[in-house]
A protein has these predicted regions:
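Bacterial Sec signal peptide processing site at the extreme N-terminus
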Residues: 11-35
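Residue-level recognition of tetratricopeptide repeat
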Residues: 29, 43-46
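Leucine-/aliphatic-rich long alpha-helical segments
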Residues: 36-40, 68-71
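Sec-dependent signal peptide recognition
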Residues: 2-7
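Post-signal peptide N-terminal segment of secreted/secretory-pathway proteins
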Residues: 46-145
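Generic N-terminal amphipathic/basic segments
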Residues: 23-24, 35-39, 48-56
Length: 146
């Protein structure tokens, strides 16, 4: 009986460790946005999620767009992958908001699908150019480098 009591007590303590912070006081905007949308899927009239969603979307969008701008000023080839990942996050936010009626009433998200498509084509052209430069160099070591 004693062991059951202690295991039940430890279970209650662990369950109470979940964060009770409101949405706007959290530091990770992307995950917080998805948490708010998940809450709206369960309870579409949750006022805290409905009020926080426009602010969270704007913060996450601005943060990702700033990352994209900083990556685009770089000249390294890996910038394409970083930019595509940031646009993918923005597109996931768009998809999550559009799929939820309560969220789409509060926020009008931007669709980045065409931008991602164009960016992937630019990346492919840049990778192709870099690969042909390596292949045109004499010697096998340079061709294997890429």
């Amino acid at each position: 009986m004693k062991y059951i009591f202690y295991s039940f007590l430890s279970l209650i303590i662990l369950a109470s460790c979940k964060t009770n912070k409101d949405y706007l006081s959290r530091s990770d905007n992307d995950n917080t946005l998805f948490d708010a949308i998940k809450t709206l899927k369960k309870h579409n009239t949750d006022t805290t999620a409905l009020q926080a969603l426009p602010v969270l979307y704007n913060l996450a969008q601005q943060r990702n767009l700033r990352k994209i701008n900083s990556y685009s000023s770089s000249r390294e080839l890996s910038r394409w992958d970083k930019m595509i990942n940031a646009y993918s996050t923005l597109q996931e936010m768009y998809n999550a908001i559009v799929e939820n009626d309560a969220a789409s009433r509060v926020v009008t998200p931007v669709n980045y699908q065409q931008t991602m498509y164009d960016l992937k084509h630019e990346a492919a052209a840049d990778y192709y150019t870099a690969a042909t430069v390596f292949l045109n160099k004499p010697g096998r070591a340079d061709a294997k480098q890429f």
